[in-house]
């Protein structure tokens, strides 16, 4: 079910309801329920990127092979990101970092280190503004292209993979992705590492959610993530999984 099909179904239901009201006097409250259901579905379709409601996003890979991809959002975040990079290097794991463009300024060497150590860089917008999903498609595209320019100036590469801020999608995000030639990336395992404060609970949540072809969402801005990462990597391997870089798992070129 996507936005277009849902709207067609909704129009059909409204017409049926109008017909029923004329013949059977369904009453005004019924229209209120219809509106509530419509708004609820639109909200969930925007919030849950895996629904593919407004925009087709890659959230996992269909496979029977036991491998997953690690992804980190919102960085780079100075010391926290450096600690995560050290742990990944020690464990010979390559990951995807969906960076915020404004965070790259002043941390150019850290971004270069990510590339040099075999990690992939993705576009997570330049501003990561809390009202990003309310931007016009033109403003969204300017924001994404700004991030891409900054990244290219520092590293020589311009990211194709884009993860929407907060994972929120809508028609304008879809227009932006199509016009900019981006590939929308979601996730199949949301760690909630920015919310969960108990390390054991965080580990249990992630490890119990593992499935072949999963994309795991983490944040290199979160201190608890760096603290649990060594045990997380061990736990993933103990369960027979390999960790490979996102673009390699998808077999797609991550840069223009």
Where are these regions (language model features)?
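Terminal accessory/targeting
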Residues: 1-70, 82, 86-96, 208-256
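Active-site beta->alpha N-cap acidic-glycine motif
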Residues: 42-135, 142-153, 157-158, 242, ...
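A cross-domain feature marking catalytic cores of carbohydrate-active enzymes
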Residues: 72-74, 99-101, 123-125, 164-166, ...
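Divalent metal-coordination and catalytic microenvironments
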Residues: 73, 88, 97, 121, ...
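A short acidic, amphipathic alpha-helical/loop segment
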Residues: 83-84, 109-113, 172-176, 228-232
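Short, hinge-like loop/turn segments at secondary-structure boundaries
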Residues: 112-116, 138-142, 178-180, 202-205
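Short, solvent-exposed loop/turn segments at secondary-structure boundaries
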Residues: 133-138, 196-198
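His/Asp/Glu-enriched short active-site or ligand-binding loop at hydrolase and phosphoryl-transfer sites
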Residues: 160, 168-170, 174-209, 241-252
